[in-house]
Amino acid sequence: MNKTAEEIVESRRCASEGLTNALTSITVKMSSVLVVTVILLSYYFARLAIRTLWKNNIFSNSTRLILLVCLLNSIIHQTTMLEIRIRQIYRSIVFASEPCRLPFHFTECEVELFVYYLTTYFSTYSVFSLAFDRLISCYTPKYYLSHQYYVSIFLLFIQLIFTLGTYYVGLYGVPPLGYEPFCNYAPKLATNFVKINDFRTLIMGICIIVTVFVYYLSVKSEKQIQQTSYSPGERYIAYENVAASQSVCILIVLQFACILISSLGVNYLRIFKSTLSDEEYNKLAPFFVGVTYANLCLPLVIHCKTKLTIRNRKLRIGVMTSMYGDVGEHINRLKKSWE
Protein backbone atom coordinates (compact mmCIF):
# COMPACT_ATOMS: atom_id res chain seq x y z
CA MET A 1 0.00 0.00 0.00
CA ASN A 2 1.54 3.32 -1.03
CA LYS A 3 2.12 6.08 1.48
CA THR A 4 -0.33 8.46 -0.19
CA ALA A 5 -3.27 6.12 0.41
CA GLU A 6 -2.25 5.66 4.05
CA GLU A 7 -2.01 9.40 4.54
CA ILE A 8 -5.44 9.92 2.98
CA VAL A 9 -7.27 7.51 5.32
CA GLU A 10 -5.35 8.82 8.35
CA SER A 11 -6.18 12.42 7.51
CA ARG A 12 -9.95 11.81 7.76
CA ARG A 13 -9.99 12.05 11.53
CA CYS A 14 -12.93 14.40 11.83
CA ALA A 15 -16.44 13.39 10.78
CA SER A 16 -17.88 15.33 7.87
CA GLU A 17 -21.01 17.38 8.37
CA GLY A 18 -23.11 14.65 6.75
CA LEU A 19 -21.56 11.90 8.90
CA THR A 20 -21.99 13.99 12.05
CA ASN A 21 -25.65 14.61 11.23
CA ALA A 22 -26.15 10.89 10.56
CA LEU A 23 -24.44 9.61 13.72
CA THR A 24 -26.35 12.02 15.96
CA SER A 25 -29.67 11.50 14.15
CA ILE A 26 -32.77 9.74 15.45
CA THR A 27 -32.55 7.30 12.51
CA VAL A 28 -29.17 5.88 13.56
CA LYS A 29 -30.23 5.78 17.21
CA MET A 30 -33.37 3.87 16.19
CA SER A 31 -31.22 1.42 14.23
CA SER A 32 -29.21 0.80 17.39
CA VAL A 33 -32.41 0.30 19.41
CA LEU A 34 -33.59 -2.20 16.78
CA VAL A 35 -30.29 -4.08 16.78
CA VAL A 36 -30.07 -4.18 20.59
CA THR A 37 -33.66 -5.48 20.76
CA VAL A 38 -32.85 -8.21 18.23
CA ILE A 39 -29.76 -9.16 20.24
CA LEU A 40 -31.65 -9.39 23.54
CA LEU A 41 -34.34 -11.53 21.90
CA SER A 42 -31.64 -13.75 20.40
CA TYR A 43 -30.19 -14.34 23.89
CA TYR A 44 -33.59 -15.43 25.15
CA PHE A 45 -34.28 -17.79 22.26
CA ALA A 46 -30.69 -19.11 22.25
CA ARG A 47 -31.24 -20.25 25.83
CA LEU A 48 -34.49 -21.95 24.83
CA ALA A 49 -32.90 -23.51 21.74
CA ILE A 50 -29.92 -24.94 23.66
CA ARG A 51 -32.28 -26.41 26.25
CA THR A 52 -34.47 -27.79 23.44
CA LEU A 53 -31.52 -29.44 21.67
CA TRP A 54 -30.36 -30.91 24.97
CA LYS A 55 -33.69 -32.23 26.28
CA ASN A 56 -36.12 -32.48 23.34
CA ASN A 57 -33.84 -32.97 20.36
CA ILE A 58 -35.52 -33.86 17.05
CA PHE A 59 -32.31 -33.80 14.99
CA SER A 60 -29.59 -36.39 14.54
CA ASN A 61 -26.62 -36.18 16.90
CA SER A 62 -24.51 -34.83 14.05
CA THR A 63 -26.94 -32.04 13.20
CA ARG A 64 -27.44 -31.27 16.87
CA LEU A 65 -23.70 -30.80 17.47
CA ILE A 66 -23.44 -28.46 14.47
CA LEU A 67 -26.42 -26.44 15.70
CA LEU A 68 -25.04 -26.20 19.25
CA VAL A 69 -21.69 -24.90 17.98
CA CYS A 70 -23.49 -22.41 15.74
CA LEU A 71 -25.60 -21.21 18.68
CA LEU A 72 -22.49 -20.62 20.80
CA ASN A 73 -20.91 -18.73 17.90
CA SER A 74 -24.07 -16.63 17.55
CA ILE A 75 -23.95 -15.65 21.24
CA ILE A 76 -20.34 -14.46 20.85
CA HIS A 77 -21.26 -12.53 17.70
CA GLN A 78 -24.30 -10.89 19.29
CA THR A 79 -22.30 -9.89 22.37
CA THR A 80 -19.66 -8.27 20.17
CA MET A 81 -22.30 -6.38 18.20
CA LEU A 82 -23.99 -5.27 21.43
CA GLU A 83 -20.71 -3.84 22.71
CA ILE A 84 -20.09 -2.08 19.38
CA ARG A 85 -23.53 -0.45 19.38
CA ILE A 86 -23.33 0.64 23.02
CA ARG A 87 -19.95 2.29 22.37
CA GLN A 88 -21.32 4.09 19.33
CA ILE A 89 -24.46 5.32 21.13
CA TYR A 90 -22.34 6.56 24.03
CA ARG A 91 -19.96 8.41 21.71
CA SER A 92 -22.78 9.93 19.61
CA ILE A 93 -24.34 11.39 22.77
CA VAL A 94 -21.23 12.50 24.67
CA PHE A 95 -19.33 13.86 21.64
CA ALA A 96 -22.30 15.06 19.57
CA SER A 97 -20.77 18.54 19.25
CA GLU A 98 -17.20 17.29 18.64
CA PRO A 99 -16.95 15.87 15.09
CA CYS A 100 -13.30 14.91 15.53
CA ARG A 101 -14.12 12.56 18.42
CA LEU A 102 -17.12 10.82 16.84
CA PRO A 103 -15.35 8.28 14.54
CA PHE A 104 -13.36 5.32 15.85
CA HIS A 105 -9.74 4.83 14.82
CA PHE A 106 -8.90 1.36 13.53
CA THR A 107 -6.69 0.68 16.56
CA GLU A 108 -9.69 1.27 18.85
CA CYS A 109 -11.61 -1.49 17.08
CA GLU A 110 -9.02 -4.22 16.47
CA VAL A 111 -10.44 -6.71 18.99
CA GLU A 112 -14.06 -6.07 17.94
CA LEU A 113 -13.19 -6.40 14.24
CA PHE A 114 -11.33 -9.66 14.82
CA VAL A 115 -14.16 -11.29 16.80
CA TYR A 116 -16.96 -9.74 14.72
CA TYR A 117 -15.68 -10.91 11.34
CA LEU A 118 -14.58 -14.36 12.50
CA THR A 119 -18.03 -15.03 13.99
CA THR A 120 -19.71 -13.45 10.95
CA TYR A 121 -17.92 -15.75 8.52
CA PHE A 122 -18.47 -18.77 10.78
CA SER A 123 -22.21 -18.00 10.81
CA THR A 124 -22.20 -17.69 7.03
CA TYR A 125 -20.52 -21.04 6.47
CA SER A 126 -22.77 -22.83 8.96
CA VAL A 127 -25.09 -23.34 5.99
CA PHE A 128 -22.33 -25.45 4.41
CA SER A 129 -22.11 -27.78 7.42
CA LEU A 130 -25.89 -28.11 7.71
CA ALA A 131 -26.44 -28.70 3.99
CA PHE A 132 -23.75 -31.35 3.60
CA ASP A 133 -24.71 -32.99 6.88
CA ARG A 134 -28.13 -33.63 5.33
CA LEU A 135 -26.57 -34.71 2.03
CA ILE A 136 -24.36 -37.30 3.73
CA SER A 137 -27.29 -38.60 5.77
CA CYS A 138 -29.29 -38.99 2.57
CA TYR A 139 -26.69 -40.80 0.44
CA THR A 140 -24.86 -42.86 3.07
CA PRO A 141 -27.42 -43.37 5.86
CA LYS A 142 -25.73 -46.43 7.41
CA TYR A 143 -22.32 -44.77 7.63
CA TYR A 144 -23.93 -41.55 8.82
CA LEU A 145 -25.85 -43.23 11.66
CA SER A 146 -22.76 -45.06 12.92
CA HIS A 147 -20.33 -42.11 12.59
CA GLN A 148 -22.45 -39.06 13.36
CA TYR A 149 -19.95 -37.24 15.56
CA TYR A 150 -17.13 -37.84 13.08
CA VAL A 151 -19.27 -36.36 10.31
CA SER A 152 -20.19 -33.26 12.30
CA ILE A 153 -16.61 -32.65 13.52
CA PHE A 154 -15.29 -33.02 9.97
CA LEU A 155 -17.87 -30.56 8.60
CA LEU A 156 -17.23 -28.08 11.43
CA PHE A 157 -13.50 -28.31 10.70
CA ILE A 158 -14.12 -27.43 7.03
CA GLN A 159 -16.41 -24.61 8.20
CA LEU A 160 -13.58 -23.28 10.38
CA ILE A 161 -11.09 -23.51 7.48
CA PHE A 162 -13.49 -21.51 5.28
CA THR A 163 -13.83 -18.94 8.08
CA LEU A 164 -10.10 -18.52 8.67
CA GLY A 165 -9.38 -18.48 4.94
CA THR A 166 -11.95 -15.76 4.31
CA TYR A 167 -10.63 -13.67 7.19
CA TYR A 168 -7.06 -14.11 5.95
CA VAL A 169 -7.90 -13.02 2.41
CA GLY A 170 -10.05 -10.11 3.50
CA LEU A 171 -8.59 -8.64 6.66
CA TYR A 172 -5.31 -10.24 7.68
CA GLY A 173 -2.39 -7.85 7.37
CA VAL A 174 -4.55 -4.80 6.66
CA PRO A 175 -2.71 -1.72 8.04
CA PRO A 176 -4.33 -0.42 11.28
CA LEU A 177 -5.17 2.93 9.74
CA GLY A 178 -8.25 5.04 9.14
CA TYR A 179 -11.43 6.06 10.94
CA GLU A 180 -14.89 4.47 10.90
CA PRO A 181 -18.25 5.47 12.47
CA PHE A 182 -18.83 1.90 13.76
CA CYS A 183 -16.30 -0.68 14.90
CA ASN A 184 -17.85 -3.39 12.70
CA TYR A 185 -17.23 -1.49 9.47
CA ALA A 186 -14.56 -3.03 7.27
CA PRO A 187 -11.33 -0.98 7.17
CA LYS A 188 -11.05 1.27 4.13
CA LEU A 189 -7.78 -0.41 3.15
CA ALA A 190 -9.45 -3.86 3.01
CA THR A 191 -9.58 -4.09 -0.78
CA ASN A 192 -11.01 -7.63 -1.06
CA PHE A 193 -14.15 -6.97 0.98
CA VAL A 194 -16.59 -6.91 -1.97
CA LYS A 195 -15.12 -10.10 -3.46
CA ILE A 196 -15.49 -11.85 -0.10
CA ASN A 197 -19.16 -10.90 0.13
CA ASP A 198 -19.74 -12.23 -3.39
CA PHE A 199 -17.99 -15.50 -2.45
CA ARG A 200 -20.12 -15.86 0.69
CA THR A 201 -23.27 -15.32 -1.37
CA LEU A 202 -22.14 -17.96 -3.89
CA ILE A 203 -21.49 -20.54 -1.14
CA MET A 204 -24.90 -19.90 0.41
CA GLY A 205 -26.60 -20.20 -2.98
CA ILE A 206 -24.94 -23.57 -3.62
CA CYS A 207 -25.94 -24.79 -0.15
CA ILE A 208 -29.58 -23.81 -0.73
CA ILE A 209 -29.61 -25.85 -3.96
CA VAL A 210 -28.09 -28.85 -2.13
CA THR A 211 -30.57 -28.58 0.75
CA VAL A 212 -33.63 -28.26 -1.48
CA PHE A 213 -32.39 -31.29 -3.47
CA VAL A 214 -31.94 -33.34 -0.28
CA TYR A 215 -35.39 -32.30 0.94
CA TYR A 216 -36.87 -33.39 -2.41
CA LEU A 217 -35.15 -36.78 -2.12
CA SER A 218 -36.39 -37.19 1.47
CA VAL A 219 -39.99 -36.46 0.48
CA LYS A 220 -39.72 -38.80 -2.52
CA SER A 221 -38.25 -41.56 -0.35
CA GLU A 222 -41.00 -41.15 2.26
CA LYS A 223 -43.71 -41.44 -0.40
CA GLN A 224 -42.15 -44.66 -1.70
CA ILE A 225 -41.96 -46.11 1.80
CA GLN A 226 -45.57 -45.11 2.48
CA GLN A 227 -46.60 -47.06 -0.64
CA THR A 228 -44.40 -50.15 -0.20
CA SER A 229 -43.81 -50.62 3.53
CA TYR A 230 -46.32 -51.52 6.21
CA SER A 231 -43.84 -51.27 9.08
CA PRO A 232 -44.74 -48.37 11.40
CA GLY A 233 -41.09 -48.10 12.44
CA GLU A 234 -39.80 -47.72 8.89
CA ARG A 235 -42.54 -45.27 8.00
CA TYR A 236 -41.82 -43.25 11.14
CA ILE A 237 -38.07 -43.04 10.38
CA ALA A 238 -38.87 -41.80 6.87
CA TYR A 239 -41.16 -39.15 8.34
CA GLU A 240 -38.43 -38.07 10.78
CA ASN A 241 -35.94 -37.69 7.90
CA VAL A 242 -38.35 -35.42 6.06
CA ALA A 243 -38.99 -33.36 9.20
CA ALA A 244 -35.26 -32.93 9.86
CA SER A 245 -34.51 -32.02 6.23
CA GLN A 246 -37.39 -29.54 6.21
CA SER A 247 -36.14 -27.89 9.40
CA VAL A 248 -32.61 -27.54 8.05
CA CYS A 249 -33.98 -26.22 4.75
CA ILE A 250 -35.95 -23.52 6.58
CA LEU A 251 -32.88 -22.62 8.66
CA ILE A 252 -30.64 -22.28 5.62
CA VAL A 253 -33.14 -20.23 3.62
CA LEU A 254 -33.63 -17.83 6.54
CA GLN A 255 -29.87 -17.62 7.14
CA PHE A 256 -29.38 -16.93 3.44
CA ALA A 257 -32.07 -14.24 3.37
CA CYS A 258 -30.68 -12.47 6.44
CA ILE A 259 -27.01 -12.71 5.49
CA LEU A 260 -27.88 -11.52 1.99
CA ILE A 261 -28.89 -8.24 3.65
CA SER A 262 -25.35 -7.66 4.85
CA SER A 263 -23.40 -9.18 1.94
CA LEU A 264 -25.26 -7.99 -1.16
CA GLY A 265 -26.87 -5.06 0.66
CA VAL A 266 -23.56 -3.57 1.74
CA ASN A 267 -22.06 -4.21 -1.69
CA TYR A 268 -24.90 -2.33 -3.41
CA LEU A 269 -24.64 0.50 -0.91
CA ARG A 270 -20.96 0.83 -1.72
CA ILE A 271 -21.63 0.72 -5.46
CA PHE A 272 -24.30 3.44 -5.27
CA LYS A 273 -22.51 5.44 -2.59
CA SER A 274 -21.67 8.13 -5.14
CA THR A 275 -25.38 8.75 -5.77
CA LEU A 276 -26.16 9.16 -2.05
CA SER A 277 -25.18 11.99 0.22
CA ASP A 278 -22.80 11.20 3.07
CA GLU A 279 -25.65 11.60 5.53
CA GLU A 280 -28.05 9.31 3.61
CA TYR A 281 -25.44 6.57 3.24
CA ASN A 282 -24.53 6.57 6.93
CA LYS A 283 -28.19 6.52 7.97
CA LEU A 284 -28.89 3.42 5.87
CA ALA A 285 -25.73 1.39 6.50
CA PRO A 286 -26.34 0.66 10.24
CA PHE A 287 -29.48 -1.32 9.37
CA PHE A 288 -27.55 -3.79 7.17
CA VAL A 289 -26.45 -6.21 9.88
CA GLY A 290 -27.80 -9.41 8.37
CA VAL A 291 -25.81 -11.83 10.53
CA THR A 292 -27.28 -10.23 13.66
CA TYR A 293 -30.77 -10.86 12.27
CA ALA A 294 -29.77 -14.40 11.22
CA ASN A 295 -28.56 -15.12 14.76
CA LEU A 296 -32.09 -14.43 15.99
CA CYS A 297 -33.67 -16.64 13.32
CA LEU A 298 -31.40 -19.60 14.17
CA PRO A 299 -32.57 -20.25 17.77
CA LEU A 300 -36.10 -19.12 16.96
CA VAL A 301 -36.48 -21.73 14.21
CA ILE A 302 -34.84 -24.47 16.30
CA HIS A 303 -37.18 -23.87 19.23
CA CYS A 304 -40.42 -23.34 17.30
CA LYS A 305 -39.79 -26.08 14.74
CA THR A 306 -38.97 -28.55 17.52
CA LYS A 307 -42.22 -27.81 19.33
CA LEU A 308 -44.17 -28.16 16.08
CA THR A 309 -42.41 -31.39 15.13
CA ILE A 310 -43.01 -32.96 18.54
CA ARG A 311 -46.70 -32.12 18.27
CA ASN A 312 -46.91 -33.52 14.73
CA ARG A 313 -44.86 -36.54 15.80
CA LYS A 314 -47.44 -37.49 18.44
CA LEU A 315 -50.24 -37.15 15.91
CA ARG A 316 -48.31 -39.17 13.31
CA ILE A 317 -47.48 -41.98 15.74
CA GLY A 318 -51.12 -42.14 16.79
CA VAL A 319 -52.30 -42.34 13.19
CA MET A 320 -49.75 -44.99 12.19
CA THR A 321 -50.31 -47.24 15.18
CA SER A 322 -54.10 -47.02 15.07
CA MET A 323 -54.33 -47.43 11.30
CA TYR A 324 -51.83 -50.19 10.67
CA GLY A 325 -51.03 -52.00 13.90
CA ASP A 326 -48.58 -54.78 13.02
CA VAL A 327 -48.06 -56.36 9.60
CA GLY A 328 -50.24 -59.35 10.44
CA GLU A 329 -53.22 -57.21 11.27
CA HIS A 330 -52.72 -55.23 8.08
CA ILE A 331 -52.62 -58.42 5.94
CA ASN A 332 -55.81 -59.69 7.62
CA ARG A 333 -57.55 -56.42 6.77
CA LEU A 334 -56.38 -56.74 3.17
CA LYS A 335 -57.72 -60.32 2.96
CA LYS A 336 -61.10 -59.21 4.25
CA SER A 337 -61.22 -56.39 1.74
CA TRP A 338 -60.48 -58.85 -1.09
CA GLU A 339 -63.25 -61.31 -0.13
From Swiss-Prot:
One annotated GO biological process: sensory perception of chemical stimulus
Keyword field: Membrane, Transmembrane, Transmembrane helix
SS bond list: none
TM region(s), chain numbering: 26-46, 65-82, 112-132, 151-171, 199-219, 248-268, 284-304
Its membrane topology: Multi-pass membrane protein
Keyword Kinase recorded: no
Main location: membrane
Pfam families: 7TM_GPCR_Sra (PF02117)
Gene: sra-24
Cell compartments where the protein resides: Membrane
GO CC terms in record: membrane
Entry protein name: Serpentine receptor class alpha-24
Domain of life: Eukaryota
Keyword Iron included in the entry's annotation: no
Assigned protein family: Belongs to the nematode receptor-like protein sra family.
Gene Ontology MF terms in the entry: G protein-coupled receptor activity
